[in-house]
């Protein structure tokens, strides 16, 4: 691992770049917060998406093996965003050059989706994806994610996929 990497910093930078890229393609974008400090609870973040066409939560993953280097799109158990989830996982794989291909994954909890942000979005009728940009326990992936230029490439590629999915390209 690279000790200078913080998932929260990467996610914050990437979301700002992705927001700009989506807006440049004609989409309206809202975020769950306006500053990096402070945060809503997990389910409340998802619920903030009421009225939106998509809730997207940006992350990097972690595991106990430094060799795992793959994107993962955690989709809601409803299956409504499986196609877009796979497309986003594929583009993360292509842009980052991860060792393993991207996949989608679902996890059922006691009250619907296991992940609070997905559960919250589903409760207000918003299709949702939690997108893992590989694993920050992998040094190559972490070093890639530390580059602002790489995050810009990722934001542009993800914005193209989302815009195409919604028929805007």
What are these regions (language model features)?
Residues 1-2:
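Short, surface-exposed beta-strand segments enriched in small/polar/acidic residues
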């Amino acid at each position: 691992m690279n000790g200078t990497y913080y998932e929260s910093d990467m996610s914050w930078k990437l979301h700002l770049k992705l927001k700009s890229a989506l807006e440049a393609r004609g989409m309206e974008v809202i975020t769950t917060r306006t500053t990096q400090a402070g945060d809503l609870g997990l389910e409340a973040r998802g619920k903030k998406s009421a009225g939106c066409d998509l809730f997207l939560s940006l992350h990097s993953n972690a595991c106990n093996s430094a060799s795992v280097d793959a994107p993962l799109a955690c989709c809601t158990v409803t299956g409504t965003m499986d196609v877009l989830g796979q497309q986003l996982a594929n583009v993360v794989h292509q842009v980052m050059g991860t060792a393993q291909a991207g996949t989608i994954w679902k996890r059922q909890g006691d009250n619907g989706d296991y992940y609070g942000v997905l559960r919250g979005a589903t409760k207000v009728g918003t299709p949702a994806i939690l997108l893992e940009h590989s694993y920050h326990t992998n040094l190559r992936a972490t070093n890639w994610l530390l580059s602002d230029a790489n995050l810009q490439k990722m934001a542009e590629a993800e914005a193209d996929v989302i815009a195409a999915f919604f028929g805007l390209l």
